[in-house]
Amino acid sequence: MFIRKSQNLTGALFMSISMAGYVTNDAFMKLVGSELGLAQTIFIRGVYCSIFIFILFMFKNEKNLKGCFNHFKIITARSLLELFATIFFLIALINMSFANVNAILQTLPLVITVAASVLLKETIGHKRAIAIICGFFGVLLIIKPGTNDFNSYSILAIFAVLSVTFRDILTRKMPKNLPALFLSLVTSFIVTLTTGIYLVFFKIWAPID
């Protein structure tokens, strides 16, 4: 019981740190994306992320990589969901207020919990179910569907939430011995490669001062 609580606390700590990183990243992406364009911004960020993750990956010296390629299909599917989530979210972020986008993102833990209950057969419980319902109503009060603040870009933000939800469900189904850095590296590489091909094909590149 103590071990499980300790694991939950560790997971919550890393989740909090990652969320702080996400918010910082979102602020910079909104600032830069409006100047350079979506694809170029994702590509440049992807190059730096891929290099950084690759250095960490080499430093950690993962040896159990042969078995990773046995799960290539699910890893690729997860990476594509990450790509869709990134595109949907950043389009919404660039064209909406920061507050409204993040208000929609507040539904993410609620949607993931419901999806885990349906797809992974995880137990929610009455108290948690009531909290989820209240949470959804709270988010609806913030985003106010039907008003001018809720537009087509809001729908893209919702698609981003759904993409992240299915991405996390796939992640949950992956073997626990699959190196997280390998998964992150493949995901970053696929996202960067896809946007890079798009930039080359359409020859879209804004000068960087």
Residue ranges and their predicted role:
Residues 1-20, 50-77, 126, 178, ...:
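Membrane-interface interhelical linkers
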Residues 7-11, 43, 67-71, 139, ...:
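Juxtamembrane helix-entry segments on the extracytoplasmic side of multipass membrane proteins
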Residues 19-24, 54, 79-87, 109-114, ...:
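Hydrophobic/small/kink-forming positions within alpha-helical transmembrane segments
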Residues 27-30, 38, 53, 149-206:
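Transmembrane alpha-helical segments that form core, pore/gating elements
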Residues 34-40, 88-105, 176-181:
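Structural motif at transmembrane-helix junctions in multi-pass transporters
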Residues 61-99:
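Specific transmembrane alpha-helical segments of multi-pass solute transporters/efflux pumps
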Residues 89-91, 108-130:
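C-terminal transmembrane-helix exit sites in multi-pass transporters
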Residues 127-144:
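Hydrophobic transmembrane alpha-helices of multi-pass small-molecule transport proteins
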